[in-house]
A protein has these predicted regions:
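Domain-scale recognition of functional cores that engage charged ligands
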Residues: 5-404, 409
Length: 410
C-alpha cells in the first residue's frame, strides 16, 4: 500500500464515465484488440457480460459504485437520526460540504454524489466556505443541532482544511477583519452532525498512522497478536518520520544518509493530503540538507515503490500521446466509528460500527513526470476489466486452477 487517504471519494465517480468510453472502444474495435483469452472466437472483452460482473462493484460502467458511495452518506444520516431523534423531522437532514473560499477545482468530483443523493434519497447537499459558515451557521443551545441557512445538518463533509493553517488565527487584525476559522471548526466539531472525516484524522492524516504501522517494534507493543503484526507489516510500505532525526539509535539516521546519497530511491512527503506535495530526486537532497528548515521534521520519508511499466495511450484535451506508465489501483471504502470517552475503569475507545468496500478506480500515470495528476494531464483515469478465475479457466484450459483471482485489462 502506497498511501491511505481519509478524505477524497472522487475517483470512482469519474472513472465510471471513463469506463463507458472504454466499453465503446472495446466493442467497436474488438477485432483489433487481441486479448489473450477467448480462442474460441469469444473475445475476453465481453467477459463484462458475465453475471459476476453484472452484480459487482467492479462492473465497468456500472452505477453500483455511485449508489454504494451515496448509500454510505445515507447510512451516516440514518445514524445521525438515531442519535438525534426528532419527531418533527421530515425526511433526512442535509449534507454540508465545506469547500475552499477562493476556488474549488474538485467540484465535479462530488457533483455526482450530490445528484445521486437528491434523485434517489431526497437528500440535499449544501456547499459553503468557512467564512460563509461563520456568518450563516448556528448551533441550537439545547439540542446541539447544527443549522446552516435554517436547515438541519446531519453530515459535514470537509473538502477544505487539509492542514492546520486555515484554522489558526495568528494576528490580531485577522480577528477584526474575518472569522476565526478555528472557532468555526470547533463549533462544527462540538455539534451533533457526523463529520467526514473527524478532525483528528484530518489533521494527523493517515500518513502518521502508516508510519507507525511500518514500525515493527511499535506493532509488537500495541497489536493483539503475532498474526496481526505480520498482516499489518505486509500491507504498509516502509516509511519513517523525520521527527526522530538525530536521536541516537533511530533508524531514520541511516535512512537520512542513504536518501541524500540515493534520493531516487525515496519520496519525501509532508503531512498533508491531496496531490502536488511530494518531493523527488534532487528535491529530496536539497530539502534534507537544509537542517535549519523548521518544516523538515513535519515530513515523512518513504521507500520508493518501482512498479512495472507499460506503454499506455493517454487521451488528453482531444488528443493522445503514448508513454511508459504505471497503473495505480485505488480501493474506496466507508468506515463508521463511535468514540467512547475514557472512564475510571476503561480507556477511551473507537468502536467500529460499519465497514464496507464501496468501489475502486485506476489511474494510468506517466512515469516521466515528477508527480502525475489527472488535473494536470499527466495521469488519466481508467477502469479495469476484472475476469473471474472460473471464466479464465473456462476460456483457457491450460491455466492452473486458482492461479489468478482476477486479471486486469486496461
Amino acid at each position: 500500500m502506497v498511501e491511505y487517504n481519509t478524505i477524497c471519494i472522487a475517483g470512482p465517480f469519474i472513472t465510471v464515465r471513463a469506463s463507458q468510453i472504454q466499453n465503446y472502444v472495446g466493442a467497436k474495435y474488438q477485432d483489433d484488440l487481441k486479448f489473450p483469452y477467448g480462442n474460441d472466437g469469444t473475445h475476453t472483452f465481453f467477459a463484462k457480460d458475465h453475471q459476476y460482473l453484472k452484480d459487482s462493484l467492479f462492473a465497468a460502467g456500472s452505477q453500483a459504485q455511485i449508489k454504494a458511495h451515496a448509500g454510505s452518506f445515507v447510512k451516516a444520516l440514518e445514524l445521525y437520526c438515531e442519535s438525534v431523534p426528532d419527531v418533527s423531522r421530515k425526511g433526512l437532514p442535509r449534507v454540508l460540504i465545506v469547500i475552499e473560499e477562493s476556488s474549488d477545482r474538485w467540484t465535479n468530483d462530488y457533483k455526482t454524489i450530490e445528484m445521486e443523493l437528491m434523485a434517489n434519497y431526497s437528500v440535499y447537499c449544501m456547499r459553503a466556505s468557512f467564512p460563509e459558515i461563520a456568518r450563516e451557521a448556528r448551533v441550537d443551545p439545547e439540542s446541539n443541532i447544527l443549522y446552516f441557512r435554517g436547515k438541519e445538518i446531519g453530515l459535514v463533509y470537509f473538502r477544505a482544511g487539509f492542514e492546520e493553517g486555515p484554522h489558526i488565527v495568528t494576528k490580531a487584525e485577522d480577528l477584526a477583519d474575518g472569522p476565526d476559522f478555528w472557532k468555526v471548526r470547533e463549533m462544527i466539531e462540538l455539534s451533533m452532525p457526523i463529520k467526514l472525516p473527524s478532525i483528528d484524522f484530518q489533521l494527523a492524516t493517515f500518513k502518521k498512522f502508516q508510519q507507525q504501522f511500518s514500525d515493527r517494534a511499535y506493532l509488537d507493543k500495541v497489536a493483539q497478536s503475532e498474526e496481526l503484526v505480520n498482516r499489518l507489516g505486509k500491507v504498509f510500505s516502509t516509511i519513517w518520520s523525520m521527527e526522530n532525526l538525530g536521536v541516537e539509535g533511530a533508524e531514520i539516521n541511516e535512512v537520512y544518509k542513504d536518501a541524500i546519497a540515493h534520493p531516487e530511491n525515496y519520496y519525501l512527503k509532508p503531512q498533508k493530503e491531496g496531490g502536488g506535495n511530494n518531493l523527488v530526486n534532487d528535491e529530496i537532497r536539497q530539502k534534507l540538507q537544509d537542517l535549519d528548515d523548521p518544516e523538515l521534521k513535519t515530513y515523512i520519508i518513504q521507500k520508493r515503490i518501482v512498479p512495472p511499466l507499460v506503454d499506455t495511450y493517454h487521451c488528453v484535451k482531444g488528443g493522445y500521446y503514448v508513454s511508459e506508465s504505471f497503473i495505480e489501483i485505488g480501493i474506496a471504502s466507508s468506515l463508521f466509528t463511535k468514540f467512547n470517552a475514557a472512564t475510571e475503569s476503561s480507556p477511551a475507545t473507537n468502536v467500529v460500527i460499519d465497514s464496507q468496500m464501496i468501489g475502486m478506480f485506476c489511474k494510468s500515470k506517466d512515469s516521466s513526470v515528477k508527480e502525475a495528476e489527472v488535473c494536470k494531464g499527466t495521469a488519466c483515469l481508467t477502469f479495469p476489466l476484472p475476469i473471474p478465475t472460473a471464466l479464465i479457466q473456462e476460456k483457457s484450459k491450460g491455466l492452473a486452477k486458482g492461479k489468478l483471482e482476477m486479471t486486469v485489462k486496461i
